[in-house]
Amino acid sequence: MFMNCRRVKKWHFLQLLSMCCVMSVLMVCWEHVDHHVVSHVKSYSYRYLINSYDFINKSLSVSPEEAARFGSFPYLLDRRDVCKNKDVLLLLFVKSSPGNFKRRQAIRSTWGNESYISQELGVVVKVVFAMGVRPDRSGHKTMQRELRKEHMAHHDLIQQDFLDTFHNLTVKLLLQFRWTHENCAHAHFLMSADDDVFIHVPNLVHYLQELKSQNVRNLWVGHVHRGAPPVRKRDSKYYMPFDMYQWSSYPDYTAGAGYVVSGDVAAKIYQATQSLNASMYIDDVFMGICAIAAGVSPQEHVYFSGEGKTPYHPCIYEKMITSHGHEGDIRYLWKAATGPQVEGISSGLLGKLYCAAVKMTLLCKPYFTNTYSCMAAFT
């Protein structure tokens, strides 16, 4: 009896000690916890209103003349006949910057190689690079001369006369949808991707061919962010002033690193941009605002990555669509992801069990990775 009482007292003491430790950590880190947890809980509870009603669009609506001011920059480099007289399955816009020549070359020789896509996959995919002008005006003339040479060699640069900076990403989005509307409106699908994104084009083409055969409409697919709160810290790259966006939650949107819309959605988004305030410089969020106006909701695809780089493994390559953060290894990954070692790796019962175990190990982490979710391990 005496021993039992001692055990009970010891257990209560340990509980009290643990609670004190937890409370101490919370008190020290409360500001951090409040920002990253409480704000997310608060914004997620608010997202239903944002996604269900149009008051957000009314607050950001502008006249057609005002909207045109954001997307009326003159073209410096262009090629209007890219899609002419072609049955284009996919128009793929790569968001690049003037100085990223090596990235563009890597893309042209791997997943963006139109000849490979036509010969090996039997479809027409047109790849073009969207950009503004170099912010540093001191080297502007030299850079433009190099870009003209590049364009003469490859005929795939779409450049407008705006400063190519983070705060002009929405202007680059407007460029993409305007150019599509004017020059490639008949494309079945439109994709927007960063120039440090790896795209497994064979997997993407097979996926889109299946959707095309089903005559899918109202498609906007990618890695979906739901209930994300605006960042109010001034020192953040993603800082959002209250006077620009006063709501507690952003509308649902896909990660701007890579997403796909069907042709009808591309047309609707373009129309939405004609009456919305594009000074919202976070292009992913602006896309979500346009989608509300267009009556379109984003769809999650577990093999579109967020901001993170996906694990390297044949079991991942077999179904991957995009992976983000590849500045110098695109050629290596292309060779690895499309090589013979990937084909049939999950065939048969043992193959399925093996790849399921591998993907669970690589993807099901107890912390946030911003790449494929754990759900991808079970598909």
Swiss-Prot record:
EC number: 2.4.1.206
Sequence intervals crossing the membrane: 13-30
Keywords, alphabetical: Glycoprotein, Glycosyltransferase, Golgi apparatus, Lipid metabolism, Membrane, Signal-anchor, Transferase, Transmembrane, Transmembrane helix
Topological category with respect to the lipid bilayer: Single-pass type II membrane protein
Cellular compartment(s): Golgi apparatus membrane
Enzyme class, broadest EC rank: transferase
Principal subcellular localisation of the protein: Golgi
Cytoplasmic face of the membrane: 1-12
Keyword flag RNA-binding: no
Glycosylation sites: 57, 113, 168, 277
BP GO annotations: lipid metabolic process; protein O-linked glycosylation
Alphabetized GO MF terms: glycosyltransferase activity; lactosylceramide 1,3-N-acetyl-beta-D-glucosaminyltransferase activity
Residues forming coiled coils: none
Pathway field: Protein modification; protein glycosylation
Pfam families linked: Galactosyl_T
Residues on Lumenal side: 31-379
GO CC annotations on file: Golgi membrane
Similarity comment: family membership: Belongs to the glycosyltransferase 31 family.
Role, per record: Beta-1,3-N-acetylglucosaminyltransferase that plays a key role in the synthesis of lacto- or neolacto-series carbohydrate chains on glycolipids.
Name of the featured protein: Lactosylceramide 1,3-N-acetyl-beta-D-glucosaminyltransferase A
Gene name tied to this protein: b3gnt5a
